[in-house]
Amino acid sequence: MIETEKKIERVFLVGVELPDTENFDLSMEELQSLAKTAGAEVVGSYSQKREKYDSKTFVGSGKLEEIRQMVDAEEISTVIVNNRLTPRQNVNLEESLGVKVIDRMQLILDIFAMRARSHEGKLQVHLAQLKYLLPRLVGQGIMLSRQAGGIGSRGPGESQLELNRRSVRNQIHDIERQLKAVEKNRATVREKRLESSIFKIGLIGYTNAGKSTIMNCLTSKSQYEADELFATLDATTKNINLSGQLNVTLTDTVGFIQDLPTELVSSFKSTLEESKNVDLLVHVIDASDPHHEEHEKTVLDIMKELDMLDIPRLTLYNKADKAEDFTPTLTPYSLISAKADNSRAVLQQVLLERMKELFLPFTIKVAPAKAYKIHDLEKVAIIGNREYTDDVETISGWIAEKNKWKLEEFYD
């Protein structure tokens, strides 16, 4: 292993816009944010419109020379391309520019390697990196061996990726075996949770939309949050109290981004399953972001890929205090500011109202002999009105379909 370099890398960004490219400007803005998240200093960027990518060097020969001059003049150490490069393009660009060249996918994988905290998260990132690198290692070992550390070559934790092509397939097999064991245990825990009467809520959204802030607001506990991309990788599930004795579970997991590498979606499938096996998906959107509609589409596309579109949803437009003249595009929705003083009470009420729409209304009469059963009912139902007539208490409220059997305990 080569020691990871600590110095800040000076990077130059390159993007090519084809006639059918969507949201190109947004994609380039994100590339800059990704580079900064990875710890780089972005010195400049270059964009070009073309009918198609150059099969050898991605950009045309004339523009390639302009980039080379910029690299030399600004002492650039790394060029980051806003597209997935072929192994051939990668080699040719490095030979022409004389510096390390990585693409958007490799940059995202690198950030995931930095962010991974749990054993499972590190395994998932390592697997995604190896799957990405494998076709680039075959016949391209020399190119990759020249990458003397830094952005694009970091592995989970402190060490760098092992770029020995002879062992990569064995590493992939070994990691997949380890992840199967982890997933078996996760599946057991998930199965118990599915059998539980507790209502399950999952947070989903674009990276940096504020999911962890909402998690912290509702739990009054510390979940790492920051104004940066991919602050959270590992799925976190916590119990929260919404009203009276009513408890639910709340799961936060990795955020999405445009052009999320397929290797990551595949490797993190078990983690993303945590948000799939819920009763309600809360889609968090940054209302203050001018590109929020594009972010919505990206998340919905990935949800479709993961077969999650049929799960009941609530859209939370977060950071509403920073959004002027905002018009929601998804329903049902609620405008919130997760960092406002009253945010917890507001969020609790918003969730309860959405749950009422999904639950079954009920009214029961409770005789004194069965009053002791009310406590258990309060743990799974939203209690509305309670009235006493003589010794009989009439309770109305809402309860999930899967828990309606609990009402039978009160019937004669």
Residue ranges and their predicted role:
Residues 1-110:
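N-terminal accessory targeting/assembly segments
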Residues 2-3, 26-29, 52-68, 234, ...:
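Switch II of P-loop NTPase G domains
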Residues 17-21, 50-52, 84-87, 106-109, ...:
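Conserved nucleotide-binding/hydrolysis micro-motifs of P-loop NTPases
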Residues 18-22, 54-57, 115-119, 160, ...:
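Flexible beta-alpha connector loops of hexameric P-loop NTPases
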Residues 30-34, 68-71, 85-95, 245-246, ...:
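Conserved C-terminal guanine-recognition region of P-loop GTPase G domains, centered on the G4
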Residues 99-149, 156, 309-314, 319-368:
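Canonical P-loop GTPase G-domain recognition
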Residues 146-262, 275-276:
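Conserved G1/Walker A P-loop phosphate-binding module
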Residues 358-412:
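NTP-binding/hydrolysis catalytic cores, primarily Walker-type P-loop NTPases
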